[in-house]
Amino acid sequence: MKGLYIKSYGCQMNVYDSLIMENIIKPLGFTVVSEPSEADVVILNTCHIREKASEKLYSELGKIRKIQENKDLTIVVAGCVAQAEGEEIFERSPFVDIVVGPQSIHTLPELLVKAHRIKKQVINIDFPVISKFDAIPVEEYTKNQETSAFISVQEGCNKFCTFCVVPYTRGEEYSRTVEAIFNEALVLADSGIKEITLIGQNVNAYHGTYKGCEWDLGKLIQHIAKIPNIERIRYTTSHPRDMHQSLYEAHKLEEKLMPFVHLPVQSGSDRILKKMNRKHTAEEYIDIISHLRKQRPDIAFSSDFIVGFPGETEEDFENTIKLVEKVKFSQAYSFKYSPRPGTPGAEYPNQVPEEIKSERLLRLQKLLREQQLAFNRSMIGETCTVLFSSKKGKFDNQIIGKTAYMQSCYINTDNPSQFYNSISPIKIIDAHQNSLTGVVC
């Protein structure tokens, strides 16, 4: 058997795509290996959201080239950097054999055979998103997923935020049919999956069809919830502009839908939000949060923030702080703005100096960490349901599960295997910055 090594960067969609690539390549006589030095094919499934992601790719390629010098090794660059940079990757790293975009991954077996046969570099960065889903049997999406699984319901983006490359690397919005998604969920349920996360670049923009009628995400969630063996449903990543009544109702009515929403806001300044082309205000975002809390009082939120967007003043940044103080997030992701080539933001004047961006990021992250710790500590003494896989902690008798709020929860037990792939009531006895400690009830 030949060795296959895949390294995935970035979002959940890349994790999902990496699993697909693994499953469609293994029938060619490959087995997955844990180190690139053991591989005959190395795939780097890249992200292009942040500047450092590209830097990480070329740094990793430099390391893998040293392996290639001593063995016959095929190097594949996949994902959004592949889509954005295309032939430039061959120019910067001429030892790379294949470049394939995220909507062309279904052609990888053919590309591997072609590259081996003609001994030349090959590239496919087309946008055949529909043929991508049509070309890959549902079984290939669902293999090797243990307790939780992703289902891609929507890909691409039509929002064109001025800081973001996704519309250029993933293409326009496309929604899969209800039947295709439901069939995939059925296969996952039959394989023992307990939790499904519906994913998309703008997942709540989902508008798939069922028997000639258009469905939204809220209706899709309630349909999937009818599958008996599926006990938890999540969705990510959503956009404030695409929140809708049906989704609010799903949070109110469907117990299987977890009380946790990742809803990126990016900034608390209306002026900056307008420059970002977000097409919502800070107050509209807060109204969405309030409405969701009315529907589901125990709901919690995470978000994304960008500090130092071009032209951001101290007053703009303080408005972001005020929004964070008002919402109170259970967790969040925050970054310094980095110009992405080809986006409008990269051409804006008044780029914020790096030292100011760093100082603001530290202030924001301090507040976000305080809120996360406070939320975790509020769980002490509570009994919550925890979904366990077979993931172990640092010690032989320790296993790790996941709460409804995506917190890691550690328990000690003499028989860890009894909890594998199960949901159990756990009493929380301690809380830390990024995790909880519990005991079996």
Swiss-Prot record:
PANTHER family: CDK5 REGULATORY SUBUNIT-ASSOCIATED PROTEIN 1 (PTHR43020), MITOCHONDRIAL TRNA METHYLTHIOTRANSFERASE CDK5RAP1 (PTHR43020:SF2). The lineage of its organism: Bacteria, Pseudomonadati, Pseudomonadota, Alphaproteobacteria, Rickettsiales. Belongs to the methylthiotransferase family. MiaB subfamily. Its EC number is 2.8.4.3. Gene3D superfamilies: Methylthiotransferase, N-terminal domain, tm_1862 like domain. It comes from Ehrlichia canis (strain Jake). Its cofactor is [4Fe-4S] cluster. Residues 143-374 form the Radical SAM core domain. One of its GO terms (molecular function) is N6-isopentenyladenosine methylthiotransferase activity. Catalyzes the methylthiolation of N6-(dimethylallyl)adenosine (i(6)A), leading to the formation of 2-methylthio-N6-(dimethylallyl)adenosine (ms(2)i(6)A) at position 37 in tRNAs that read codons beginning with uridine. It is found in: Cytoplasm. It catalyses: N(6)-dimethylallyladenosine(37) in tRNA + (sulfur carrier)-SH + AH2 + 2 S-adenosyl-L-methionine = 2-methylsulfanyl-N(6)-dimethylallyladenosine(37) in tRNA + (sulfur carrier)-H + 5'-deoxyadenosine + L-methionine + A + S-adenosyl-L-homocysteine + 2 H(+). GO terms for cellular component: cytosol. Keywords: 4Fe-4S, Cytoplasm, Iron, Iron-sulfur, Metal-binding, S-adenosyl-L-methionine, Transferase, tRNA processing. [4Fe-4S] cluster 2 binds at C157, C161, C164. Residues 2-117 form the MTTase N-terminal domain. Binds 2 [4Fe-4S] clusters. One cluster is coordinated with 3 cysteines and an exchangeable S-adenosyl-L-methionine. It comes from the Bacteria. This is tRNA-2-methylthio-N(6)-dimethylallyladenosine synthase. CDD domains: Radical_SAM.
